[in-house]
C-alpha cells in the first residue's frame, strides 16, 4: 500500500549566544492529506498540531532560525493482517504517524464538548543529509495528533521531548480518570523541559531512543502501559534504543476488535508469554505481528485444563517409566494406604496384562481415555436378576432350625391346598399353662415376633375347637334339657380365651394371673 503524503514542518531552534535568558514559543503544524485508496475508512484528513515552549537559559551559542520544508513522496507503508508498519532506515529523516482507523471519519476539534479527541505523542529525529540544518544538532519535537476516540478532551500540557539530563515524567492516559505514570531516563545534556505525553487508543512510536510498546487492554480502553527508557547513550547516536514495559497483561477475550491493533509499528522490545521483561536494542526490523499481538489460548476442554487421563495412563502404557512412577507414589505421604498400594501394583505389573481397578473420579472423561494403551479392556457385567440367598427360617419348634428350600424365583409360592407330605406345624407342640401363658417356647423368649406368631396360631386352633364343640353340646342339650352342666362347661372354656386375648395386650414379660386382672 502506498501513501502519498506531504509533510510541511516549521522548525525554530533557538540556542542563544547571549547571556540573557529568553523564552520563545514555537507552533508546529503538520497537515497530512490522504487519498481515498490509501485507507479502508475513506477520505480522511489529519491535522497534527504541536506547541513547543522553550525556556532558554544563558549560554554562548549562535541564534539560528531555519525554516525547512520537506516533501516525502510516497512513504511506503506495509500492512499486515492486524497492523500497519512504517518502514524506516537509520540516518534518515522519518516521521512516524500512527492513527487509529476505527471510526469512519477522522477530524480535529478544539472544543471541549465536540468530537472526542485522542492525543498521541511521537518524536521526530532530524539529522542526516536531507536537511538544511547542521548534522550535529539534534532537535526533538513533540507532535500531538488529534483523533476522535475519547469522550472528554483532557487538557494536559504537552511539551517537546528535550535532551536534558533530568528525568521526565510520562503519563499515558488510557481512560478518563485512569492513567499510568513512569519515569524516563536521562537524555543528552541540553535544554531542560518537563515532558508529559498523553496517549489513548493508539500504539506508541518507535523512534529516536524512545519506544512505546503495544500493551493490551485495561477495563475500557485498549491500552494501559508504563514506559521506561533504558537507553543511556545520546539519542542522536543510538537510534534503536529499547525500553522496558512493566506490568504487561495479555489481552483476553474481546467481543469487539481492538482499535489500537489496526495501526501498530514494529516494536523494539517484546514481552514473553510468561510475563518476563525482555529488552533488546537490535530487534527493530525482526518482529512480526504474530510475535507482538498474540491472544492466549482459551481453556475450553478437559484435556487443556489438566483433567484428562494422560497422567493415569502414563504409568501403565510405557514400561520405561516404572521407576519414576514408583518414586512418585512414594512421595505421596498424605495419600491413603490403598492408593499407594494400587500405584505400586500398577508399577509392578506393567509388563503383564493389567486390569484397570481404579475408580474414575472425573465427570468429563470416558472409559476409553482411561483404558487407552491397556491390553485388556475394563471388565463389564450386564445387569442380572439377583436371587435371594438361602436363609435359615426361624421356627417355634423343639427341633433346631432347618434350612429353607432354595427357590429360583424371588416371589414365594402360594399354596391354597394343604400339603399332606409337609410336616405339621410346630406350634402344636408349644406347652401352655392353665392361664394361657407359654412356659416352654424354643426361641420364643428371645424373639417377641415369633412368640406373637405362636400365640396367634394357638388362638386360631382354639377358635376352631370352640366352633366344633358347641354344635355337639347343643345336640346333647336337646336330649337332656334338665342338665345344666354344659353351661358351666362353656364358661370354663371361655375363660382361657379371655385370658389369651388379655395376654396379647400385655407381653409375656409382664405375665399376670387372670384372677388378679378380673
Curated annotation (Swiss-Prot):
Pfam families in UniProt: GRIN_C (PF15235)
GO terms for cellular component: plasma membrane
GO terms, biological process: neuron projection development
Ranges of biased composition (kind: Basic and acidic residues): 476-494
InterPro entries: GPRIN2-like/GPRIN3, GRIN_C
Domain of life from the UniProt record: Eukaryota
Chain residue ranges for the region called Disordered: 1-23, 467-500
Function, in words: May be involved in neurite outgrowth.
Subunit organization: May interact with GNAO1.
Protein name per Swiss-Prot or TrEMBL: GRIN2-like protein
Source organism per UniProt: Gallus gallus (Chicken)
